Amino acid sequence: AFDLDTPSALEAIAQFHEPTYLHQLITSGNGTNLYFTDLPEALAELRDPAFGSQGQQEARVHFHIPLYAEPEPPLRSTKDHVGDLLDYRKSHPEFCSHFEIETYTWGVLPGDLQKPIVRQIAEEYRWVFSQL
C-alpha cells in the first residue's frame, strides 16, 4: 500500500514490477475506487498529471510479500489486516483450523526483500505462530 500524494511512492512500487505474475492495483479516494489489471497499466495512469484531479488518495497492490517483512517507506504492507484476523481466530478457534502461507511471488521480490527460501519460510512460520 502507499499514499498517492507521496512522490517517491510510484518509483518505489515500480521496483515490484516483474512480468511473471499480474499485480492488480486498486486506488481509493472520494468514495470511489479505481481498478487496474497489472502494475504497468496502473503506473502509466498514476504518472499521468491528469490523474491527480480524480481525488484518489491511497493505492494497494496485490503482491504476496512475507508477513515478517515490511517494505521500505513510503510503501507499507497490509499485514495489520492479517493481525486482526489472527486476533479474531484466538477467540474463535473454530473459525479456521489451518493456515496457508503463499510463497509463490517471493522469488520475484525486489532484492532488499530477497532471502534464501528456507529461511523465508521459517521466518514466516515464526511470525504467524507468534501472533497465535
Model-inferred region functions:
Residues A1-L132:
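Histidine-acidic metal/acid-base catalytic patches
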